[in-house]
């Protein structure tokens, strides 16, 4: 009889351990729920998506309103095209809204931040519908580029003179003579 009780307790413990392992796996896979809410699809094209991945969150002010459904390469422009699945209850997003790739923390995962624009029928703005494209996008900031800008003082402009010697100070028209010569 005592052996039967021990077997039941071991079975309960194993079942609890399996449920805990399943919970951890779902959290690690970033699965928020088993049920699916109705969504609509939006598209956006970026110059550089960095480490953005499918299933990355789309948020407005820190609140997750959707997910990245797919990332493909546009066959005409060869730019990354991101497909977004936005929850249907957030269906009043103006077409003046912008989308930027951000990183949670210094080296955390990347997500899409949706900055809601303004709606003004007199200016011809509209609400984004299923299948529309967000025009105003800001690409991911690449850590190596930021470090390079900091180290070399670049402001993001093209570095066509980066290997040139520094120019003479204005008003200094003095020329240098080789050593051993006199003026």
UniProtKB/Swiss-Prot annotation:
Segments for region (Disordered): 155-183
Transmembrane spans: 8-28
Annotated segments matching region MCE/MlaD: 39-116
Alphabetical UniProt keywords: Cell inner membrane, Cell membrane, Membrane, Signal-anchor, Transmembrane, Transmembrane helix, Transport
Predominant cellular place of this UniProt entry's protein: membrane
Record's keyword annotation contains Ligase: no
GO CC terms, sorted: membrane; phospholipid-translocating ATPase complex; plasma membrane
Topology feature Periplasmic, residues: 29-183
Composition-biased stretches (Polar residues): 172-183
Stretches of the chain forming a coiled coil according to its record: none
GO annotation, biological process: intermembrane phospholipid transfer; phospholipid transport
Record carries keyword Membrane: yes
GO molecular function: phospholipid binding; phospholipid transfer activity
Recorded family membership: Belongs to the MlaD family.
Subunit text: The complex is composed of two ATP-binding proteins (MlaF), two transmembrane proteins (MlaE), two cytoplasmic solute-binding proteins (MlaB) and six periplasmic solute-binding proteins (MlaD). Interacts with MlaC.
Domain notes: Forms hexameric rings with a central hydrophobic pore via its periplasmic domain, which also binds phospholipids. Contains at least four binding sites.
Functional description taken from the UniProt entry: Part of the ABC transporter complex MlaFEDB, which is involved in a phospholipid transport pathway that maintains lipid asymmetry in the outer membrane by retrograde trafficking of phospholipids from the outer membrane to the inner membrane. MlaD functions in substrate binding with strong affinity for phospholipids and modulates ATP hydrolytic activity of the complex.
Name of the protein in its database record: Intermembrane phospholipid transport system binding protein MlaD
Organism annotation: Escherichia coli (strain K12)
Gene (name only): mlaD
